[in-house]
Each structure stands twice: as C-alpha cells, then as structure tokens.
Amino acid sequence: MGRRAPRGSPEAAPGADVAPGARAAWWVWCVQVATFIVSAICVVGLLVLASVFRDRFPCLYAPATSYAKANATVEVRGGVAVPLRLDTQSLLATYAITSTLLLAAAVYAAVGAVTSRYERALDAARRLAAARMAMPHATLIAGNVCAWLLQITVLLLAHRISQLAHLIYVLHFACLVYLAAHFCTRGVLSGTYLRQVHGLIDPAPTHHRIVGPVRAVMTNALLLGTLLCTAAAAVSLNTIAALNFNFSAPSMLICLTTLFALLVVSLLLVVEGVLCHYVRVLVGPHLGAIAATGIVGLACEHYHTGGYYVVEQQWPGAQTGVRVALALVAAFALAMAVLRCTRAYLYHRRHHTKFFVRMRDTRHRAHSALRRVRSSMRGSRRGGPPGDPGYAETPYASVSHHAEIDRYGDSDGDPIYDEVAPDHEAELYARVQRPGPVPDAEPIYDTVEGYAPRSAGEPVYSTVRRW
C-alpha cells in the first residue's frame, strides 16, 4: 500500500504518479464527466420525446389555466384564487434552454479532458490538476443532479403531480445556481484562479484557451440560463405557497412579484460583488434577468386579464403596482449591466490586456469602414466615381498592438509621402532674411533698353546697356 517502489521498477519511472491514488482520482473524474454527458443527453431526449408524444405529457404541454370570466354585476368579496402558472411557450423555452446549456457544459468538460494532456510525459496527478481547472468534481456532481432533477420535474408534470413537481424544480434551481457559481469560481480565491490560468499560457496554450476565454463564454451562458430560470423558480415557489395558504388573486400577483424581485436582485448582487472578480465581462446574467422579467410580466398580465373583476374588486390598482415593480427590476438589471461593462472596460484599459487591444483595433477598423462608406456615398451623390480617398484609411488597421502610435495616430513605419515638393515660399523668405548675391542665378531681364542709375558698388544687372 504505502511501500515505496524499488528502484528500477516500472512504478519508479519518471512518468509514474507522484501522489498516491492520483490515477484512481483521474478515472473517477472521467466517469463523472461521462455520467454528466449521459444525463444531459437524457434530459434533452426527454424534452424531444415530450414534444413528439404530447398525449403522454398532458400537464406539461397543456395550455395555461383558463379563468372563466366573472359576472360584472356580481360583487366579489373574497375567495381563494387559483395558483398562477407560466404559459406553455415560456415554460418549455426555459426547460429547453436549461437542458441545452447543461449539454454544452458537459461537452466543455469532455473537451477539457482532452486538452488537459498538454505534454506526452504527463503523470496522472498533473493531468488531473489540469482537468480540474476545466471543471472540478463538485461542479460535475451539481451538473448531474441538476439534469436528473429537471427530468423528474418533467415526468411529475406529465403525471399531473403539480405540487411535488414545483418542489423538485425549486431544488433543481438551487442546484443550477450552485453549478453556475462553482463553475465560475472553481472553489478557489480570485487571485489563485488568475495565477493558475495565466500559468498555462506558455506550457499549455491550447488548454489555456479552454480554461480562459472559452470558460468565460460558458460562464456567461450558464449565468444567463440561471437568471432566466428565476421566472420559473418564482412561479414554483408562489405555487407551493398558494397550495398551502389561502391566497387571494391580488395577493398571488404581489407574492410572485416579490419573490421574483428578491431572486433577481440577490443574484445580480452576487454577480457584481463576487463573480466579477473571476470573469470581468459578464453580460449574460443581466440579459437573462431582463428576459425573465418579461416572462413574469406576461404571466401576470394573463392572470390579471382572466380575473380582472376579482382583482380590481379585492385590491384596486394592484396590477399597476406589479407593473411598476417589474419595470424597476428590469431597470435595475439594465443599470447593473451598464455598471458591469464600465468596470470591465476600465479594468482592461488599466491593465492593457489583450482583450482591450483587440477591442480597440476592432473599433478602429469599424471607424475606417464607416468613413469609407460615407466617402463613397458622398461621391455617388456628386455624380463622380465612389473612389477610395486617402483619408479613409486609418493607420491602426495595419499596425499591431506592439507598435508605437503617436498622438496623431501615425506609427513609426513607412513615411506617408515618398517625395516632397520644394517649397518656393520658404526659399524666398530665406533670401529676404539673408540678402546677398544669388549664386549662379539667371538674370531677370536679358534685354532691358532703358536707363538705370548705377550704385556705388557692382551693377545689379550685368547686361544693361547705357545710352
């Protein structure tokens, strides 16, 4: 067990495992990746089968609860309201996006397993460490649990077990939040995370792209799906509360709006306070929050339209307050997105990262293309050929980020003009400032026939005739 291998044995070779059990841990990680892929494929296949055999999944694909129109002449003084639910298109779109993101995360883990072998003579311990940078064990477990809980939710809805289905979906949402957060942080501090990623630039450039830029894209996608699921999670929590307590119709709308606002604001604050130190450019969660706000607003409008007289009789103006609250949530998400983009831009500009250099070059190329289009449009309006004027080209298009650019936008490359014409005015001013004989100059008048007074010195014109 713990006995050291004798010298000269195959176990004592340089490629042998340094840490005991590293090879077993590596195979366990591979099995977790395989089960994650199978779970994601199963949940995608289940949704596809549910769309084909709709009779087998009646509760999942059933239309939203139809509320009978109340008699306007009857005074409504109370009563227990029906639980609010999402419409079919919004619910299925949320499930489909979630399952697709889970499958993409599983494929990403498989790609990370392939690129983790960046050297031929790489032992299991070092390869396991490189593979964990793509996706740790805890993230894989959360992904597996998340996929299976979503399948259980769909099957429970198919069997019309609504309350248990909503409870399972709340657990699925909690696992999805943990999956997205742990995928972003890997369970380490931000400084350690950055040092580990930057340490792969030279020895493993391919694996660095996977755990660096590609991982940032996957983080945005998972956070987008997580914030998008806040609408379905808020509806599930509201349904559980409505099935256990006596809610009126206005209370149903207010409870749903409050739960949704708490979920969105809390997650966006976590993104801005914690996760932004790992991935600077995070716009996915804000887009997901805005989309989820639209889904909740649509569900509230349908619910209010079906029970208009009940809602207005029990709590007049409740729907107006719901609309204002949802608008404030969307505005908060938009403001946080602007704040995140501004802080990310300032960070990349201060550290002069490659992302900032590429963004600056892209902006210069876009400005150059826009100037060419404008010049061609002006040429076409004047009736001449569109042409390609010289000022349409900017020097940034052909200058790399390593070249030095002066304050006017010119680099230290080739000169703009190959031949410079002589300046006659400068020569004339030089003669005025320094009067004297002009060497080898041609006479101004060759055949002057008049009288000119002579000075004490040499004659000005050598060919003037006296008479």
Swiss-Prot record:
The chain crosses the membrane at residues 33-53, 91-111, 138-158, 164-184, 221-241, 251-271, 281-301, 319-339. Residues 371-395, 432-459 are annotated as: Disordered. Residues 1-32, 112-137, 185-220, 272-280, 340-467 are intravirion. Residues 54-90, 159-163, 242-250, 302-318 are virion surface. It comes from the Viruses. The keyword Cell membrane does not apply. Keywords: Disulfide bond, Glycoprotein, Host endosome, Host Golgi apparatus, Host membrane, Host nucleus, Membrane, Transmembrane, Transmembrane helix, Viral envelope protein, Virion. GO terms for cellular component: host cell endosome membrane; host cell Golgi apparatus; host cell nuclear inner membrane; membrane; viral envelope; virion membrane. InterPro entries: Herpes_glycop_M. Interacts (via N-terminus) with gN (via N-terminus). The gM-gN heterodimer forms the gCII complex. Envelope glycoprotein important for virion assembly and egress. Plays a role in the correct incorporation of gH-gL into virion membrane. Directs the glycoprotein N (gN) to the host trans-Golgi network. Belongs to the herpesviridae glycoprotein M family. This is Envelope glycoprotein M. It comes from Human herpesvirus 2 (strain HG52). The lineage of its organism: Viruses, Duplodnaviria, Heunggongvirae, Peploviricota, Herviviricetes. The gene is gM.
